[in-house]
Amino acid sequence: MDSLMNTTPGGGGKPVRMSSREIAELTGKRHPDVKRDIEKMLSDLSEDASIFAHIYLDSMNREQSEYLLDRDHTENLLMGYSPILRRAVLARMREMEALLAEPRV
């Protein structure tokens, strides 16, 4: 799962971003369904989805799309999910933030 998170350990100045793939993994939802939920949320907020879009290479070296969300957008997305799913994702977000806060050696 560490390969899915987008952080800079040691306080590199970048905010923690959670990928739509990691949200899907943590919630047990299909990645296409999470992407659909994100696109709907961003549309409802009148925000440009392309700002959050990211291309990655899958295991077969094919380009695939995902979204990288900051904490506010991640929490907003989770409002539509069950409390159990919200807890899992927010716990992971706290782990990522703790990694970011660790001093770099």
Region annotations inferred by a language model:
Residues 1-105:
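An anion-engaging/catalytic patch
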